[in-house]
Amino acid sequence: MNTLFMHCRPGFEGEVCSEISDHAACLDVAGYAKARPDTACAEFICTEADGAERLMNGQRFDALIFPRQWARGMFLELPETDRISVILAQLSAFPACGSLWLEVVDTNDGKELSNFCKKFEAPLRKALMQAGKLVDDPRKPRLLLTFKSGREVFLGLADADNSAMWPMGIPRLKFPREAPSRSTLKLEEAWHHFIPRDQWDERLSGDMTGVDLGAAPGGWTYQLVRRGMLVTAIDNGPMAESLMDTGLVQHLMADGFTYKPRHPVDWMVCDIVEKPARNAALLETWLGEGLCREAVVNLKLPMKQRYAEVRRLLDRIEEGFQARGVRVSIGCKQLYHDREEVTCHLRRLDVAKAATK
């Protein structure tokens, strides 16, 4: 099991290869990354048998930017019939697992395999349980089968608490009909990724205040209002009337890059389409000057050297806070609902909660 298999957004295979190669080098795991363009997946081939396991044990999955999901294991060719027997034979060297996910890559060809996986899962699950390879124990590793076709599958393992929270890393979020734009799903997914669900009532509570920079028509504002927050929406464009009618939104016609609140707020969110360095500077200003406690900001990516640019900006942000003597946590992820962008979440660790509304 010396191969680390990773899912990603189509077109970002090179970024996954660059990122995982950096982490492997830091952990002294020898190997090489490979991928084909627009296949929505990449591999890191370790030269040592335990390399993939050491890499996964030494790296938190939720700290990775571009991979959506990962698993260590091997590829297996399947016959046209009796696939289950072949899979069971190969799994003899695998430990018993506590859960089973059947996955496909995020391409048109991959999506065509979804129905096959749905039909195949029940008999496979039954066979695995009868063989003692699948038990009801969340502490045990997760068995991940990624089907490249009906004749090829990647048999993989991952710790349930150190891998994606959804199959393939794709959230099943429902678009709210009353939301003004589909961008609302980006912020909802960001909260799922960056904030543990059992902390939502504390960190996304109805007695908080927020600012949405570049708010119109209000996709991100909607998520704040949905949590009951009092929101200041900054944009020269019009806001959705449905949001204004809630009485929770104050709309100010102003420049999102120059606006500053009179009093600190709990949340700042921003999805302005601008050069990533300008949006990154907003994070430094708002968190560094204590204007907010937490922030979610999208960084639009350049056409080339995307991982290198994101890494450079994150390093600059971290160095800036260190120079200020400000303690923050920094997270960054290319979410499923992101396109040519990544989403950053920052949280100050040394300021009190803003005054309640």
From Swiss-Prot:
UniProt keyword Nucleotide-binding present: no
Top enzyme class: transferase
GO cellular component, one term: cytoplasm
Pfam families membership: FtsJ (PF01728), RlmM_FDX (PF18125), RLMM_N (PF21239)
UniProt cross-references to Gene3D superfamilies, sorted A to Z: 3.30.2300.20, 3.30.70.2810, Vaccinia Virus protein VP39
Keyword Cytoplasm set for record: yes
Active-site positions on this chain: 300 (proton acceptor)
Enzyme Commission number(s) of this protein: 2.1.1.186
GO MF, one annotated term: S-adenosylmethionine-dependent methyltransferase activity
Record-level GO BP terms: methylation; rRNA processing
Catalytic activity as recorded in UniProt: cytidine(2498) in 23S rRNA + S-adenosyl-L-methionine = 2'-O-methylcytidine(2498) in 23S rRNA + S-adenosyl-L-homocysteine + H(+)
Localization, UniProt: Cytoplasm
Residues bound to S-adenosyl-L-methionine: 183, 216-219, 235, 255, 271
Keywords noted in UniProt: Cytoplasm, Methyltransferase, rRNA processing, S-adenosyl-L-methionine, Transferase
Subunit structure and binding partners: Monomer.
Family affiliation: Belongs to the class I-like SAM-binding methyltransferase superfamily. RNA methyltransferase RlmE family. RlmM subfamily.
Purpose: Catalyzes the 2'-O-methylation at nucleotide C2498 in 23S rRNA.
Protein name: Ribosomal RNA large subunit methyltransferase M
Species name: Pseudomonas savastanoi pv. phaseolicola (strain 1448A / Race 6)
Record gene name: rlmM
